[in-house]
């Protein structure tokens, strides 16, 4: 949290934007949208070795309880409407991480007739995590980048 000044009396001054964004970065609740092998690495990131809980990232089973969607794997044309439906059920503000080459741009199956060439054609993506499959460290880095992006946003209209 960016603190503009600390007084001798023990007062802290900051902006309301900084406080709201600080609370949002400390409580990201992702919903997994695992479609292929990248989902296994996403599960690794949630286990004890990487421990996403220390960053305030707690996986939720329902889109109504989550504010972050991690799309991991090959998105087919048949699955695209379901992805959009789940995204629309999420509460505002909501963010999306695209994990892996297949979710980013179609990956190995880019030229297949049934593959969507990137999930950003269906939902707006905030952070892209490259790799085939990306490691758990790469996903962790992507989540930290998303937290930094959230800290920089203005939540209150001026």
UniProtKB/Swiss-Prot annotation:
Cofactor: how bound: Binds 1 [4Fe-4S] cluster.
Transmembrane segments: none
GO CC annotations on file: plasma membrane; respiratory chain complex I
Subcellular locations according to the entry: Cell inner membrane
Reactions the enzyme catalyzes: a quinone + NADH + 5 H(+)(in) = a quinol + NAD(+) + 4 H(+)(out)
Binding site residues for [4Fe-4S] cluster: 37-38, 102, 132
Domain of life: Bacteria
Principal subcellular localization: membrane
Alphabetized Pfam families for the sequence: Oxidored_q6 (PF01058)
InterPro entries: NADH_UbQ_OxRdtase-like_20kDa, NADH_UQ_OxRdtase_20Kd_su
Record-linked PROSITE patterns: COMPLEX1_20K
A single GO BP: electron transport coupled proton transport
GO molecular function: 4 iron, 4 sulfur cluster binding; iron ion binding; NADH dehydrogenase (ubiquinone) activity; NADH:ubiquinone reductase (non-electrogenic) activity; quinone binding
Keyword annotations of the record: 4Fe-4S, Cell inner membrane, Cell membrane, Iron, Iron-sulfur, Membrane, Metal-binding, NAD, Quinone, Translocase, Transport, Ubiquinone
NCBIfam families: nuoB_fam, PRK06411.1
Family under the similarity heading: Belongs to the complex I 20 kDa subunit family.
Subunit structure: NDH-1 is composed of 14 different subunits. Subunits NuoB, C, D, E, F, and G constitute the peripheral sector of the complex.
Name of this chain's protein: NADH-quinone oxidoreductase subunit B
Organism, scientific name: Aromatoleum aromaticum (strain DSM 19018 / LMG 30748 / EbN1)
Phylogenetic lineage: Bacteria, Pseudomonadati, Pseudomonadota, Betaproteobacteria, Rhodocyclales
Name of the coding gene: nuoB
């Amino acid at each position: 949290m960016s603190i503009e000044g600390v007084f001798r009396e023990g007062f802290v001054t900051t902006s309301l934007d900084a406080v709201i964004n600080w609370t949002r970065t400390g409580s990201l609740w992702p919903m997994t949208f695992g479609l292929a092998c990248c989902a296994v690495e996403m599960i690794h990131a949630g286990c004890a070795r990487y421990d996403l809980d220390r960053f305030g990232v707690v996986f939720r089973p329902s889109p109504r309880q989550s504010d972050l969607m991690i799309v991991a794997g090959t998105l087919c044309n048949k699955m695209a409407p379901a992805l959009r439906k789940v995204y629309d059920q999420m509460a505002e503000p909501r963010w999306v991480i695209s994990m892996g080459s297949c979710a980013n741009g179609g990956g190995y199956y880019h030229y297949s007739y049934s593959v969507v060439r990137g999930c950003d054609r269906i939902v707006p993506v905030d952070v892209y995590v490259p790799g085939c499959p990306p490691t758990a460290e790469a996903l962790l880095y992507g989540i930290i980048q998303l937290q930094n992006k959230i800290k920089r946003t203005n939540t209150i209209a001026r």
